[in-house]
Amino acid sequence: MNFSCLGLSKICFLVSVIFCTFLLLFIPKTKTPWRPRTYPQPRPPPLFNATCGKQFALPGIEHAQQKLPTHTTDITHFEDPGNVEDWRAYILGRENPDEKHEGPTDNPGEHKSVLASSINSSKDALEFEDLFIAVKTTRKYHKTRLDLLLQTWISRAKQQTFIFTDGEDQDLRQRAGIQVINTNCSAMHTRQALCCKMAVEYDKFIESERKWFCHVDDDNYVNLFSLRHLLASFSHSQDVYLGRPSLDHPIEAIERVKSDGSASVRFWFATGGAGFCISRGLALKMSPWASMGNFITTAELVRLPDDCTIGYIIEGLLGVKMHHTPLFHSHLENLQRLPLQSVLKQVTLSYGGPDNKRNVVSVGGIFSLENDPTRFRTVHCLLYPDTHWCPPRKTR
């Protein structure tokens, strides 16, 4: 009896070993072999065989690379008085910007425009608290250019405006408080210093969790009503890049493709001197090339100034087209040609330099040109007549 039980146990053991061996040999053949997954990676910034400066002759870029005087009390710019552009050259909705039109285009749908987006059905319920307005300045202009902005439009948008500068200023800190951000970037007006400030602007906007990022310079007047009206025509969750180019054609540059050739890349960029706006949805997509110091790295790889690098990331890398709008204005334009009846409808305004002080918007009736050389105070009083320093309106 014991012998038969022992034999049966051995037989069961042998059967189980054979069965396990069979499973080990058969199962791997029925399974799909494992392959490592490949996940989409951000496209690395390629090297450009070009710059926005000399090769493409952007108005004002060569000037921007120059060092500014170390001491000045002049509120205006150092610019070539002949280097202005006609604001009427920018027509909404045209595919070929080399063709200048005086009226509506025949095919406005081919190129993205503010006009097309103004009928967007997915509009934002936009409040002023949703805006992040970054003002780029330098310590040298705190008591001139920036002081003028603090007296005028910034006084109406204290919680929406953040001042990015390059030096600590206790007087400015007392006036604007935590809205002043010392970037610790160089005070030189160079490509590296400008990109350093833009990198800080981008990171601070991402931290803020606000819906819209708008960048302006310290020589821009921002019409807050027009700005909100414009941005409310779009959805902040979509890819929106709003601005005005300083050229009438996109930049065309050579992009190196490994070692077996090259390809041409073309993109528009919105000039920072007129201001531009970016939706939060698009800003988040820029993160691989713009966040945590990556913006400086990207700018160095392509050797482009700050506003050109923004356009390169958005159009050149992400493939998002810029919405061209004539509502933004820089000191490079002939501002006197802006019709009087439309001045108060613009989003940003600017003014000319010391050699071209007459390049200002044509508004009057409140302050003389001597007392208001930039015309910003006059514009502000027309928009906000209740401002305490504005003269009372004359009653007929």
From Swiss-Prot:
Topology feature Cytoplasmic, residues: 1-6
UniProt-annotated catalytic positions: 307
Subcellular location: Golgi apparatus membrane
Residue ranges the record marks as coiled coil: none
Cofactor(s) required for function per UniProt: Mn(2+)
Entry comment describing in which tissues the protein is expressed: Detected in the mesanchymal region of the developing limb. Expressed in mesoderm but not in ectoderm with no evident boundary of expression.
Intervals, Lumenal compartment: 28-396
Family: Belongs to the glycosyltransferase 31 family.
Protein name listed in UniProt: Beta-1,3-N-acetylglucosaminyltransferase radical fringe
Organism: Notophthalmus viridescens (Eastern newt)
